[in-house]
């Protein structure tokens, strides 16, 4: 049985989170491809949909193809290399997913105002986006709160967490925000922390509101 040091185990856990974020991003792209095959909104020449489709679709985005080779290599290095992977690799991947988070948020909001967008397209994007949102914000809160700090909860506190705090508590708190219908489990200590918690809460309330409206609309059409 392979035994890992605490720092090596922490890197493996973080790489697992980033890999799951990549898979959720790929799921969003698959749903867009499915809509294109069904001749829905993708082929109706709306610039915002086409731009997002090009950003997400594997055939149009070389970074997605590159990930097919890079991610397995990172896993092999993380599992079998004695040295730790450079921190910049994780931060670079995390920054890409933060960009993806913003693109997805804008896309979901714009999509609701486009009459050609089918209800399954919007609802499917929301379903794929919510777990991505939870994990991406959990990673961001953990990274900022623990970066260069002697102990966690110097920038952001987690109301329901118990000592000792670890990365899981940030993902758990992010998920609870969705389960509790937008009630934030984070509290900012510094101005940066307060700003992040505010942005997180506003984005979450927006996504939950869109999901509720779209789900209600689908139920009305079924009745």
For every predicted segment, state its role.
Residues 168-173, 183-223:
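Pore domain of cation channels
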Residues 34, 99-106, 133-137, 141, ...:
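Alpha-helical transmembrane segments of polytopic integral membrane proteins
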Residues 146-190:
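Membrane-proximal soluble regions of multi-pass membrane proteins
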Residues 59-113:
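Cytosolic-side membrane-entry/anchor segment at the start of a transmembrane helix
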Residues 106-149:
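Pore-domain transmembrane helices of cation channels
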Residues 38-57:
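Perimembrane loop-to-helix junctions flanking transmembrane segments
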